[in-house]
Amino acid sequence: MVIYAHDYGVLPNEEVAVQLENLLAAVAEIKDEKKIIFDEGDYYIESAKLQSRMLYITNTVGDAEFKNGETPHKNRCALAFCGIENAEFDFCGAEFYINGKATNVAVIDCKNLLIENLKLTPKNPNIRKMTVIAKSLFSVDFKIDGDYYVKNNALYFKGIDYDYNASGQYRFATHLAHIKAKSPKQVWRTGKLFKSAMGVSEIKPGVIRIKYPRTAFCAVGDRFYAFDCLRQYAGIFLDKSENITLQNVHQHFNYSLAYVAQDCKDLTLKSCRFAPKTEDFEIASLADFMQVCMCRGHIDVENNYFDGACDDCANFHGIHFIIESISGNKLTVAFKHPQTHGFNPISEGDEIGYISTKSLLEKGRATVLSSKLTDEYHIELEVNDTSAAAEGFAIEDITKIPTVLFKNNLAKHIITRGLLITVRNKAVVESNRFESCSMSGVLLSDDAANWFESGFCGDVLIKNNVFEFCGEVPVLIKPENKVNEGPVHKNIKIIGNTFNYKGNPVSIKCAENTVVENNK
């Protein structure tokens, strides 16, 4: 069955928020296989016309980060694929310009979906490029690329859905990325550019001057990217969906995580481009490019281009829930990181492991008989065995662990790490180029005290990759255990990689059966 978007009023060169919503709702009612075809061209979406939804998205925003009067987790989605099965969406190169803050794409309760040949371009987002054009001992002149104004010695950024004091203590404060003129391929997370500012004034339209007690932190030609760090809206969000493929999708900007999946199965991201629309802008994602949390099946990430992230390129992990109480065969477990809560990814029939938070080693297993989210932060589980459980231990859902293939990808302008991997199933990192990461290229972590991202690695191959620049050791094996009761990670092969790094390119802690060979 073939469906044409223009038959539902989704037409190029027009505002199509409501028409898109109607089209996607109609497609959800059709259970047979279908192909939806869009006309090539430019489409426009106004955020004010989008339907609001309550979305609890892992690793994004916690209740405490919202201001008084705001509704936590209230979210708008430009393209909301909800309850759709057996569908291929061919956007034929169509570009959607989103005016105002929104999650670009949401895929919720979907199955067997292909989304291809799509371009996503938020207009005038709340990030500003500030280029140093002159400096003295006590002041720096910046060229600003977007809308702003100066009021009472403070710098404000303004646009649809935002108007805030960027130079003041707004929420947790404005975040910054710093690209130095002498090393344009590298991006660094810097301190608050405005922390020591002694005043802001406008020299002429598009140019401001900030006074400082000293100006050694920058040079003429340096670029700073300043933005509000609230992770309220995502780029592409997938929840409780299965067999979802994104192919040839270009996403030019997103307000937090570019691609975030939770409680999904069998995901593919191929030949996609997450990067700025033009070369004169260098940031595309205000947080990680990818977060894959408590998914299962196979995660396939191949032939993609990632450029300009204000956090990691990709992170594959589970969640360490902390056991707060035990009553018979019932456990009350809690989300402990303030930016991850409000959803229940643990299902009846899942196998869980009881994990010592000190050693990060598994002490026993059980099967989930029932699972209920009792509030935003707690899940009540009935299990078949609590003999290895203890209050203060963590649990990891062993069923919700995928195999991972990350192959033939390019990662550049990454402000922290290239990859974080904490999955016990097979993970292959092969033939990628990590052009610039200000921290490690690949980190095998595991923690139950900070981000609570589980778990141990059981079979990892890191092969034929090029680590062109890493600000820290390129391959770092570092579980965050507090005591040593034995190796946490195992079966790791680091073979045939090229490291451009002064110092030891591999660091290993608490791992067994690790092979490092034929690297250069």
Protein language model regions, located:
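Extracellular beta-strand-rich solenoid/capping regions of secreted or surface-exposed proteins
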Residues: 24-30, 45-88, 97-116, 124-138, ...
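The right-handed parallel beta-helix/beta-solenoid scaffold, focusing on the short coil/turn
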Residues: 34, 41, 77, 85-87, ...
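Short glycine/acidic-rich loop motifs that flank beta-strands on beta-rich extracellular proteins
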Residues: 47-48, 98-104, 124-128, 233-235, ...
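Small/polar beta-strand repeat architecture
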Residues: 185-231, 362-404, 412
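Alpha-solenoid helical-repeat scaffolds
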Residues: 190-283, 288-292, 299-305, 310, ...
